[in-house]
């Protein structure tokens, strides 16, 4: 049987080879048979694309394209969609240029498309008005400051988010930046040679729509400025201070915009502990809308420089700190009592200091819901804050609303020595979250509408899915 199968296979292959040779010589089937017979697969695929395009309503095409924009490699797919027909081109081009993905090879063609002429009045590209997000973070040595300035000038009418490149952003870019009146996000954190801070603040001070502002890490070194004369954008919500921010700057900051909701202080090698504390108690504490604070990568802070931060900022809901600058005393009630005599704090709402201090509960931080612990890279800090320290603070009532603890993996809470303690802390947080669900408080107030927890679910469905576990516990992240 095996020999018969082998012989049959050999004969079949020989027949196929002979048939291919005849087809190549023009032999094989008669011409009429070829015309009426089955077509090859390549011919079928080719003829499918040469027929008239299938008409689709614009609404359906837009739905398809909006789905494509959520994919990882959407730019290549959107470019292909532009080649299908005029209808697809008109629908896909705005999405293609709204958030272009820029890297080394495509940067020069992008610049030539956006800026076909140096003189704006000679040739103007209509595509420049479609750019809403200009992210140049992937560019290192491509381009030069003059090209960045030209791009900002061409996209000034529509640009909403700008991430500056490392080496091609300079003083001459500020003129174009100041004209981007719709700008909402300005990220200069990667800039290696930052323009002078007074000129930078002057350029962005009148941008009414600016919500997020990240200062360059290289800015402010080698010069002393008067920060009291700096004007912040009036509607700023997210601010990141970094670079050569020193004690002179931090002591001079009088006020931040009351609209500020998130503040990050990082990568400030000249800032010392007393200057940070002064900033927190004079300029940050009066911010009633502030919800999130992050402090990390501050090499001149001492090992206990931020132990008073919970007392200084009772309004904070999310706190992210590097354990390099705190000790377990940050949760200790005796340390809270000591802080009353250590600081003379400004009033939160215009009341006298004595009345304000009497109104604040010294042993509780009633607003903190999320605590994030990171590591700035210094060795030997892994055991400064342990899960037991946080559980003791919860048991003593110092952190009554804490529900989430996020910990960098470099702190080794997942190791065999502390893994059981971390699990016990997670159980405590989840149990407290379940009580919130039962009482309808916190994120579960009003059926969870405030945080999207349990939204459009009845009570039984919420209980079946254990929605309280979605918003409470201990999470590890890379860092």
Predicted stretch roles:
Residues 3-8, 12-13, 18-26, 30, ...:
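Leucine-rich solenoid repeat modules
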Residues 40-49:
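Short, contiguous pre-domain boundary segments
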Residues 49-145:
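Hydrophobic regular-secondary-structure patch
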Residues 67, 71, 91, 95, ...:
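Residue-level signature of the C-terminal ends
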Residues 67, 103, 137, 165, ...:
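Feature marks extracellular polysaccharide-active and adherence modules
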Residues 98-100, 129-135, 159-162, 183-186, ...:
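Hydrophobic beta-strand segments of well-ordered beta-sheets in folded domains
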Residues 115, 139-289, 300-311:
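Leucine-rich repeat
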């Amino acid at each position: 049987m095996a020999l018969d199968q082998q012989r049959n296979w050999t004969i079949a292959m020989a027949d196929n080879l002979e048939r291919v040779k005849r087809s190549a010589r023009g032999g094989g089937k008669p011409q009429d048979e070829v015309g009426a017979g089955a077509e090859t697969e390549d011919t079928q695929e080719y003829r499918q694309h040469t027929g008239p395009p299938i008409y689709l309503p614009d609404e359906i095409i837009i739905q398809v394209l909006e789905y494509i924009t959520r994919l990882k490699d959407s730019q290549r797919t959107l470019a292909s969609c532009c080649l299908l027909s005029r209808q697809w081109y008109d629908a896909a081009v705005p999405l293609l240029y709204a958030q272009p993905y820029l890297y080394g090879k495509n940067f020069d063609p992008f610049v030539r498309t956006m800026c076909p002429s140096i003189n704006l009045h000679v040739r103007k590209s209509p595509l420049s008005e479609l750019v809403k997000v200009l992210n140049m973070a992937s560019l290192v040595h491509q381009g030069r400051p003059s090209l960045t300035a030209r791009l900002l000038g061409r996209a000034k009418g529509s640009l909403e988010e700008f991430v500056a490149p490392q080496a091609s952003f300079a003083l001459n870019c500020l003129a174009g930046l100041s004209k981007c009146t719709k700008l909402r996000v300005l990220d200069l954190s990667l800039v290696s040679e930052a323009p002078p801070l007074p000129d930078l603040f002057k350029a962005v001070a009148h941008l009414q729509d600016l919500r997020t502002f990240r200062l360059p890490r290289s800015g402010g070194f080698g010069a002393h400025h008067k920060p009291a004369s700096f004007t912040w954008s009036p509607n700023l919500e997210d601010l990141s201070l970094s670079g050569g921010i020193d004690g002179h700057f931090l002591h001079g900051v009088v006020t931040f915009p009351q609209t500020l909701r998130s503040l990050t202080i990082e990568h400030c090698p000249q800032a010392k502990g007393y200057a940070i504390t002064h900033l927190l108690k004079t300029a940050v504490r009066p911010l009633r809308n502030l919800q999130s604070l992050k402090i990390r990568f501050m090499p001149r802070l001492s090992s206990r420089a931020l132990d008073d931060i919970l007392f200084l900022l009772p309004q904070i809901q999310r706190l992210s700190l590097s354990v390099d600058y705190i000790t377990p005393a940050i949760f200790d009630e005796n340390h809270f009592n000591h802080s009353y005599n250590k600081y003379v704090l400004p009033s939160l709402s215009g009341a006298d200091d004595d009345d304000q201090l009497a109104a604040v509960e010294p042993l509780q931080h009633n607003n903190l819901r999320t605590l994030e612990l990171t590591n700035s890279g210094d060795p030997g800090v892994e055991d400064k804050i342990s899960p037991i320290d946080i559980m003791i603070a919860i048991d003593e009532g110092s952190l009554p609303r804490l529900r989430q603890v996020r910990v960098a993996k470099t702190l080794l809470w997942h190791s065999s020595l502390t893994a059981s303690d971390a699990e016990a802390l997670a159980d405590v947080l989840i149990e407290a979250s379940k009580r919130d669900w039962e009482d309808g408080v916190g994120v579960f107030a009003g059926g969870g509408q405030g945080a999207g927890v349990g939204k459009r679910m009845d009570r039984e469905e919420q209980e079946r899915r254990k929605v309280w576990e979605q918003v409470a516990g201990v999470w590890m992240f890379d860092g």
